[in-house]
Swiss-Prot record:
Protein's UniProt name: GPI alpha-1,2-mannosyltransferase 3
Enzyme Commission no: 2.4.1.-
Record PANTHER family: GLYCOSYLTRANSFERASE (PTHR22760), GPI MANNOSYLTRANSFERASE 3 (PTHR22760:SF4)
Disulfide bonds: none
Pathway the protein takes part in: Glycolipid biosynthesis; glycosylphosphatidylinositol-anchor biosynthesis
Native source organism of the sequence: Bos taurus
Length: 541
């Protein structure tokens, strides 16, 4: 029996190890008596892993889903759930990206299908509309985790695979993102599963059609998903003996089918033929207009973004880069290439480099596998540091913008005067979800911020105009009392500045929600809900 160097894997991993060795014995004997893998190895169908491991990772990602109760970026609602809600229930807000056809309907269609099924079953409650899509994303992430583990078992051995698996599961950023309804999350899931079928030396699951289909699907969901795959595709093409056959009989048919599927889906919902992938790349890459939403120095990913995403895995990643076999250089090239390409774009975000995180976990796993004296302290350090950060960012930091939506839900469903209720969100645009988290056609308004596509030098969005002089904006916007909303939602930093308007129009604070310990200029530590008095009484709830 192989010695357990780490001691930190526990009975769970040792049980898996024993099963793996038992299978090796049977293979050596070439016995024909053991032809029932489901009985002898406890494998779970197409996933090809021990049933207990499958159940464990599914349970973990479900717990992960419910332990992430904070907001990250607006796109996880506005570019997925909000669009799906409009597709099924005929109300919901489409941002400017959809009028300009920069986004495709392929990804929202997944959630629209879920919404439609819930609607047909009469189970389309607001809570199910919020949580079922996230649980679906969690299950997809669990499948990706299993594929990464299976791949490393094929390429190396179970001992290396379990350390890569451990690093993947305890990564704070993976925990933070993998259950969110972001295109970046789906991009990462598809990248991992595609890597399982990619032709690597030692892989037993290589399949060019399957991996290229998954890459193509990732591309039509988020066109920049092709960036990490450029080095991998070139490597495959370079090493392939039948290059013409690879292109004509595999890549081109796969690309044609997936792109045609995307065109048909978008034709149905846009009402005209459009190639959203080209529009997306033109806006974000060729024209670099994403800088409207903020720009960073060229080195940001190397100096801040990548270290923050890796967190305490960073020293193990660096260590593993020196230890991993040469055949994994392509993974390192993929990571560096992706960072370099994204560094050339002005607008930078942590989530953009999420798809290369699994590649980094391979090197982190190698580092742990080669540690001897310090293995147990290293495991404890990695687990505790990542889980503390994961729980804080998942349960505490930036939770107010989701919590306040429960207040609006109550306003919609428990208010006898709901027909006269209305809401104005005086916050940076897209701070909160919208109708996907209310599921009622309540009149709501937020401060808009579409970018200038005409080239005006003095262009100001509504949100910027508001924050130049909030009090003046309110008095100019609501000169007639009949136009006043019944409810105002704002960050705490705004309250003092607009207090004359609140007092003169009989608004009273009715709810307070904690948001963050790190307030910024327009984002306060708390969110306030104000309700307008009518005839000496507060609006009834």
């Amino acid at each position: 029996m192989e010695r357990d160097d780490g001691g930190g894997g526990g009975l769970f991993f040792r049980g898996l190890q024993n099963r793996s060795h038992e299978k090796t014995k049977l293979r050596t004997r070439k016995s024909t008596l053991y032809l029932s893998p489901q009985k002898s190895t406890g494998r779970c169908g197409d996933l090809g892993e021990n049933i207990y491991l499958v159940l464990f990772i599914i349970a973990l990602r479900i717990c992960n889903c419910f332990l992430v109760q904070t907001s990250f970026v607006p796109d996880e609602y506005w570019q997925s759930l909000e669009v799906a809600h409009r597709m099924v229930f005929n109300y919901g807000y489409l941002t400017w990206e959809w009028t300009e056809r920069l986004r495709g309907y392929t990804y929202p269609l997944i959630f629209a299908s879920i919404y439609k099924i819930l609607h047909l079953l009469g189970k389309d409650s607001v809570h199910l509309l919020i949580w079922i899509p996230r649980l679906a994303q969690a299950l997809l992430s669990a499948i990706a985790d299993l594929r990464l583990y299976s791949l490393m078992k094929q390429l190396e051995n179970q001992q290396v695979a379990r350390w890569v698996f451990f690093c993947q599961l305890c990564s704070w950023f993976t925990w933070y993102c993998c259950t969110r309804t972001l295109t970046n999350t789906m991009e990462t899931v598809l990248t991992i599963i595609a890597l399982f079928y990619y032709p690597l030396e030692g892989s037993k699951s290589m399949n060019s059609v399957k991996y290229s289909s998954l890459v193509a699907l990732a591309f039509i969901i988020r066109p920049t998903a092709v960036i990490p795959w450029i080095p991998l595709l070139f490597r495959h093409f370079w090493q392939e003996q039948r290059k013409l056959d690879l292109i004509l009989h595999q890549f081109l048919p796969v690309g044609f089918v997936t792109l045609s599927l995307s065109l048909i889906i978008d034709r149905i919902f846009f009402g005209q033929w459009t190639l959203v992938q080209y529009n997306f790349l033109k806006f974000n890459v060729l024209q670099d207009l994403g800088s409207f939403y903020g720009s960073h120095p060229w080195h940001w990913y190397f100096s801040q973004g990548f270290p923050a995403v890796l967190g305490t895995h960073l020293p193990f990643f660096i260590h593993g880069c020196f230890l991993a076999p040469k055949r994994y250089r392509i993974f390192l090239v993929t990571v560096l290439w992706t960072l370099l390409v994204y560094s050339m774009l002005s607008h930078k975000e942590f989530r953009f480099i999420y798809p290369v995180l699994p590649f980094c976990m391979v090197f982190c796993g190698y580092s742990l596998n080669n540690l001897k004296t310090w293995k147990k302290p290293a495991l404890s350090f990695l687990f505790l540091s990542n889980m503390l950060l994961a729980l804080y960012t998942g349960l505490v930091h930036q939770r107010g913008t989701l919590d306040v939506m429960t207040n609006i839900q109550e306003l919609s469903y428990n208010n006898t005067n709901v027909s006269s209720a209305s809401v104005l969100m005086m916050m940076p645009c897209h701070s909160t979800p919208y109708y996907s988290h209310v599921h009622y056609p309540l009149p709501m308004r937020f401060l808009q911020c579409p970018p200038d596509l005409t080239g005006k030098t003095d262009y100001l969005v509504e949100a910027d105009m508001f924050y130049l002089n909030p009090l003046k904006w309110l008095y100019m916007e609501f000169q007639n009392d009949s136009q006043l909303p019944t409810h105002l939602i704002m960050f705490s930093v705004l309250e003092e500045e607009i207090s004359p308007f609140l007092i003169s129009n009989n608004y009273e604070r009715t709810a307070v929600f904690f948001h963050t310990h790190f307030p910024e200029s327009r984002t306060g530590s708390h969110i306030y809900v104000y309700e307008r008095k009518l005839k000496g009484k507060l609006n009834q709830r």
